[in-house]
Amino acid sequence: MLSFAVLLGATVGCSSNPLAGAPRTIEPAAAAVSPPASQSPAGAVRPLPAHAAAAVFDAGTRRLAVLAPGSAPAAPGSLTVFGDAQAPPRVVDLPGPANALTDDGQGTAYLAARGGYFAVDLSTGHTAQVSVTDAAQTEFTAVARRADGRLVLGSADGAVYTLASPKPGAVSAASVASRNKVFARVDCLATQGDTTVVLDRGQTSVTTIDADGHVQQALRAGRGATTMAADALGRVLVADTRGGQLLVYGVDPLILRQAYPVPQAPYGLAGSRALAWVSQTVSNIVIGYDLSTGIPVEKVRYPTVQQPNSLAFDEASDTLYVVSGSGAGVQVIDHAAGRR
């Protein structure tokens, strides 16, 4: 891992200068195709026939937002917003296809799209389409929000854009503060403070970008990393789906702190103060691990809906949401961490 970090650090800088030639890649890993659920899912299941692609829980409005693609690659996607358990969810039709989802914790969701992003008010459903300067033909595939409010977007052609405005929901066009094109593809972004972590599935790597937009360290991430999530304690969780591991990183500097076997094609991730949550897509199981001792310790496990690709967690109520990627609904597990 060290040799990879040194090599990448020596060949990239803080501007948009690309590497000489395309980065070497492997076949990206993916979630397993889950069998039908063999056990009744824990908790309650709310219907959602769409094949969900991502989910976030917004603490400010106490709403769960679930992104689903359209019926065809070019068809507009939708955002389903779950609030009151006694009321039907709100379905927000998006202006176009969307590829990734994040939120600001204060009631606004941001979705990566072609040429820019969508900003959705989770309380009203109002949606704004924001274009990124000089990126009209760019397919944005990942999005995250920094602590200073700035959005970071990743693209299908391997670039990371840090936007200039600290209020991304209040602009109609977004200028770019920095751009780094050093990846094969940007599949996932996460942030800790104003540091951005980039996951490239084809390179099965994680890379940090600092607050000024400078590329910092890079490390290999197992044999086939697929998903990534940040937690409230400064850690970044990565699912090595092909290698069957949970990887836990610190970001300042980037360092692999824990690697623990998780079989059955781990994929869905959610961080929390108490436990790190990982879903197993082969077996339709979600597991909560305590990371506090330095070696992950399994504390709880629950049977899930089929294809548990997306997880979200509500710290205030200790509620875990497991969102099916096959149309089997949204599973709600109250008091998920239990007594510890």
Whereabouts are the PLM-identified features?
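Sec-dependent N-terminal signal peptides
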Residues: 1-6
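Predominantly soluble domains enriched in secretory-pathway, periplasmic, or organellar proteins
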Residues: 8-10, 14-340
